[in-house]
Amino acid sequence: MFKKILIANRGEIAVRIIRACKEMDILTVAIYSTADQNALHVQLADEAVCVGGPKSADSYLNKEAIITAAVETGCQAIHPGFGFLSENSDFARLVETCGLKFIGPKGDVIDALGNKSKAREMMIEAGVPVVPGSNGSVNTYEELKEVVNKIGYPVLIKASAGGGGRGMRKAFSEDELENAFMTAKAEAKACFGDDDMYVEKLVLNPKHIEFQILADEHGNVIHLGERDCSIQRRNQKMIEEAPCKVLDASLRLKMGESAVKAAQGAGYTNAGTVEFVLDEHNNYYFIEMNTRIQVEHPITEMVTGIDLIKQQIRIASGLPLSFKQENITLQGHSIECRINAEDPFHNFRPCPGQVNFMHLPGGPGVRVDTMLYTGYTLPTQYDSMVAKVIVHAPTRLEAIKRMRRALSELVIEGITTNQTLQFYILHQPDYIKGHFNTSFIETHLDEMVSENG
């Protein structure tokens, strides 16, 4: 087992990893930018190293400075968290080249799954259902049109190197096709430096279902059930829950088997997530595999009782999984609300500032993952997510009621958050009944804004 780990991240995920390491008697090294010198993860770690200026490119994306910090402080491994360098194959390879362990999959696997069109081909070969679309890339309008004529409208044009909803456009007719293609291609080039594109049939009103995978370095691959991540705004998740209300035991078994096949087909190791869309007729299709720990991993921890961060560290140290698929059972229901420093009633504008006072919810079945504290000044340079409120209860309805209580207890003074919008969603009849898909926010936002006045 590792004696010391560097956490190549910031915010609540860095705090989360530090806490797991402390419970495993592993020393931790935090990195920070000059904007984060008073951050909570810096205070909690055993050691902390400044790796650059406020801009992410100068600090949290500064590969050489991060690896130098790890080597000079005597670390054996680097945990990348999520975001920043977590899915950067060059970083993963560089870490290994420098004699350290990257807590995640191999760089070549990150490459293969990061290219969405290649990942699609890999899944077809592994026997995993994929949405009808192009076999490989479409890099000219003529190639695109030829595929679309076969699969029909509507379609979704996507960047092969894409993620986070960028480099992606819908087209409902031929009139929209060329503009959608050129716009998505230009955005992909600007965001990822790669304008390789592919196209899929657009699945209308889908649910976004993902399966948590654990794969050790001894060939053992299992899944830990699913998460329903359908409550999204502009392809960014807001509320996640586990398990999914609409999945029966038979469908869960089939989708779980497909998720395991996907990981096996990719030669995957460590924690990963296989994402599917589920249509209105319960047909499911692979969309991508995320090669890192997810923001929403706590809800899987709540229903399985398995600490995913500790499992990542155990796997990276060479230990085999200590449980088998038949040992995994889902107990009760868990919901997570992402608390962002933004104003949902004014076009979700960012709202950084100083936290003048904070009170976190408590009581049975309530967990809060955050890096906030009273007096902390939120930097302007980074992601707006400041906390995750997670609840667990015996049933879904009890979990909804528990989350309402938790949100009503949460007080963060000095900055505006999306807490009120989350509270509204949890009172929407369609949400309570489980009648929602990825267009839920888009459909109900105006109504919720008008209710807020």
Where are these predicted regions, by residue range?
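Alpha-helix initiation/capping motif
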Residues: 59, 84, 112, 137, ...
